[in-house]
Amino acid sequence: MQRTGKSRRALVRHQTWAVALDAAKVRFEDGWHEVKTGAVFWVEAATGKQGVGEQGQAGRIQAREQSYIAEVGSMEEAGARLYAEVIERGVDPAEQVLVCLADGAPGIWSQYALHFPHRVEVLDWYHAMEHLWAAGNGVLGESTEPAKQWVAAQEQLLWDGHVEEVIANLATLAEAPKGEAAREQIHYFDVNRERMRYPQLRAKGYPIGSGLVESACKRVVGARLKQAGMCWTKTGAQSVLALRTARLSNRWQQAWLATAALPLAA
């Protein structure tokens, strides 16, 4: 049954909506540049026990009705395009809370702050773990048993919401020989600590992993623009990405109807 605009808006207001933004490198005529890729989706909670980490949460938080954007221009242009996609989905950022996922890049947080006043910022769990592994492996040895044990302990602390204890443990590890690898990670966890309150986020049914947009970088950008020998102009890449995102967002027919409605050149 087709929903009316009014009933659709009412449904959207009661759903938990999220956005994620990331980037993938593509070869252009003047070298390699980032193509920013974003995803807009709502999340559905299911019952079931969680394990530790993003994979443990996957059993109870699932992304639904994903749509995508891609931008070869600046981060500011990507932010504007993501905002337009949120509006297209019927979400009003001026009224509705949006869960905003990112890997910690300052430019992404800035765009979220600009466009989504009622946001909940979430640092992607997988990237947080990558930074813990960088510290553990760098100080205690690549994939050694001490490194594995140290990272496992920090993972449990982070999962349970003790980010300040993780920062303190990084500071302790930084005093060891080769401690620079841990020292480099302290700032990352410090500036993102409020985005890493994972127990509270999970309790509200919010996603903590940006795996969807990581996958989007491969599906939207990589699978189409990074085949062997490909080299793009920015205009050509943006045109192809417009078609690619329309298809993957289930708006292919809509995109062609809009094109057909354009006036013919004289």
What do the predicted segments below correspond to?
Residues M1-A266:
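Catalytic center-proximal scaffold of phosphoryl-transfer enzymes
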